[in-house]
Amino acid sequence: MARSGRYKVPFRRRREGLTNYRKRRKLLLSKKPRLVVRKTNKHIIAQIVVAKPQGDVTIVGADTRILAKFGWRGDENNVAAAYLLGLVVGYKARARRVEEAILDIGLHRPAPGARVFAVLKGALDAGLKIPHGEEVLPDEDRIKGKHVAEYAEKLKEENPEAYKARFSRYLQRGLEPEKLPEHFEEVKKKIVEYYEKKLAKVAAQ
C-alpha cells in the first residue's frame, strides 16, 4: 500500500515482469531493428522487430522448432539450438535486406555465455551487424554442445539407466548425445548452404 505522495504505481507490464520500459526506450531511440530473443520452457524464439507509430512490426521470426526442417534432432532449448536459431533468423533478416540490428533480451539477465547470447552469435555469423562485447558470447565448444557430449559419455559409462533417462529425447530421435558436436556441424552446414543460395537469388534481383 502506498504511504507517500511520491509513490508511483509501475506500468502493468512492468509489474507483471514483462517489460523494462527504461531499457525499451533506449532501444527505440537507437532507431534500429531489434533482434528480440525470448525463451519458453521448451523453445527459444527470435524475431527481427521494427518500431512503428502503430506498434512493433515483426519483419522475420522463428523459434527453435524450425530447426527440424534442417534435420536437427537435439533439444530445442539448449545453447546449440539457440545458436542455430540465431543463424536462421540472421539469414532470414538479410534476405529481407536487414543488415543491422540491436539486441533486445527483455528482462533476461545478461549472463555471459547464456542462450540469448548464443542466438546473438548465430545472427552475427549469418552476417548481421549487431553491437556487442565479445566477452558475452559463448565459446565454440559450448556452442557445438561439447559439454553435453562429454557429460553424456561419462554418464553412459557410470550409470547407463540414468543416461537413458536423461537423454531419452535424443535417443528417441535417433541421436546419440555423445555425437552432438558432429550433428551440430551437419545441421549448421545445411542451414548455411540453404540460406546462402537464397541470398544469392536476392542479390541477383
Curated annotation (Swiss-Prot):
What biological process terms from GO does the record include?
Answer: ribosomal large subunit assembly; translation
A Gene Ontology term for the protein's cellular component: cytosolic large ribosomal subunit
Q: Does the keyword tRNA processing apply?
A: no
Q: Which UniProt keywords apply?
A: Ribonucleoprotein, Ribosomal protein, RNA-binding, rRNA-binding
What quaternary structure, including any partners, is listed in this protein's UniProt entry? Part of the 50S ribosomal subunit. Contacts the 5S and 23S rRNAs.
Q: Which family does it belong to?
A: Belongs to the universal ribosomal protein uL18 family.
Role? This is one of the proteins that bind and probably mediate the attachment of the 5S RNA into the large ribosomal subunit, where it forms part of the central protuberance.
Q: What is this protein called?
A: Large ribosomal subunit protein uL18
Q: Which organism is it from?
A: Pyrobaculum aerophilum (strain ATCC 51768 / DSM 7523 / JCM 9630 / CIP 104966 / NBRC 100827 / IM2)
Gene this chain is encoded by: rpl18
